[in-house]
C-alpha cells in the first residue's frame, strides 16, 4: 500500500511482486524532498503477520549531453566529503549529531555529500532522504597504500571478489534511497580489470543510477569524470574538450587551515561551463577528539600524534574541515556559504533602485526568503529597506525589481553622507518554513559599494613628517610595537608584521 506524506492512500498492489502507478507524482529532489510511505504487509490465514513501512521517493537520474540530470535538470553539486567523526564519540555518531551536520550544510548552501570512503550509518541515508541532500554513496574500498600502477590490487585477479563484494554490500543495502544519485566504486585504489568488472556488476544490478570512480579517468568505466584536486586551467581544458562525461571533482578546494581563498575561481568556471557541475570539498569537519591538555588542563581538540608515536601519524593533517570538531564554523565556511548561495542580485542600478534577482535553484522558488537592503555609511548602519517583490520567482528565472523605497533611501544617504563610503548590503533571510533552517538565517547576501571611500591625498613629505611625529613605540624583551596614524608595526627577532589602518 502506498500513501502520500499525509497518510492518504494512493494505490495498492497484491502478490509476491507487483507494481503501482502513481498519478501526478510529487518528485523527490534535494530542494523538494517529498517522501511517500509504502507499507509492505505479509499475511497468513489469520491476517497480517508483519508490516514493514518504507519511505519512498520518486526521482530520475540520467546523463545526457555531458550533464548529470536529476528529474531532467542539470543540477549543481555544491558538495562536501563527510567522514563519520564526533569529538566525543569518535567513529560513533549520534542521530542528533547527524541532524546537526545537515542543519549546518543547509546553512552553508551545501546540497550534496560523498560518503567518504565507506558506507555510513544507515540512519544517515534516512535523514538525507528526509531533509534533502544528494548523495554519492561510496563503497569501502581504498588500497593506495599497496601502490598504484602495476602494484594496484585492482590488477590482481585474486582481489576481484572483495572488489565486487564490497560494492554489492553498498548497493544492495541502500538501493531504495532516493537521496543516492550516484554510486562510487571506491577511493584511491589505482585502476585495473577488477574495477572494470565491478563497474559492470553495479550497472547490471542498478540500471537507474550513474557509477563513478575517481581513478577511472577520461575514457575508462566511469560515467562521471570525477578527478581530485585539479586546478583551474586543467578544469577549463576538460570543459572546452569534446569529453562526453559530466565534470564533478570528487575532492577539491582542500579546506585545511587558512583556506578557500581560491574558491571563487572554481565557481566562476562551474557557472560558465555546462558540463562542469561542481564538486565535493575536502572535507566537512575537522577530525579531532575533545580532550584536556596535559599541560594546561584546558579543553582542546586532539589529533594524530597526541596519543603517542604509534600508530603512524600525519599529525594535524586530518583537521582539514569546513567546520571544527564541535561543529563551530571555521572562518573559511563563510566563503563557501557565499559562493554556493542559490540567489544572486545582478545588474544593480542604485540611481533607480533597480536590480535583477536570479533564482539559481532548479526545483523551488524563493518564497521562503525575505529580502532586505541595509545601507551603511563608513560602516555605520543608516536604514534597512524591506523588499517583498521577490515572491514568485521560479527556479532558474530572473526578475527585475524596482524599489522606490530603496531609491529614496539611497538618495537620502548620498545627500547626507556624500563624502563617506556608502554601501548597500542585500540579505535573503529564511522565514523559518524550511526544515532545519532557522527563521532569520541569512541564506544569500551581497554588498554593493555605491560611493567609494575617499582617501585623503597628503603630500609625501607631510605624511612622513606626521608619521614620525605621531609614532609611538613600545618594547619588551622580545617584541617591539610601533604605532602611527597610518599603521601598526610589530617586530620580533626574525620577523616584522606591518598592518595598515586604512
Segment roles from a protein language model:
Residues 9-24, 376-420, 436:
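Intrinsically disordered, low-complexity Pro/Gly/Ser/Thr-rich segments with frequent PxxP/GP/PP motifs
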Residues 17-33, 92:
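Beta-strand-rich ligand-recognition modules
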Residues 22, 42, 357-361, 375, ...:
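Hydrophobic beta-strand positions in extracellular immunoglobulin-like domains
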Residues 31-37, 368, 398, 417-423:
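Extracellular Ig-like/FN3 beta-sandwich strand-entry sites
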Residues 42-52, 408-462:
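Terminal connector regions
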Residues 47-356, 360-383:
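Extended substrate-binding grooves/exosites of carbohydrate-active enzymes
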Residues 425, 430, 456-502:
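Beta-strand-rich N-terminal accessory domains
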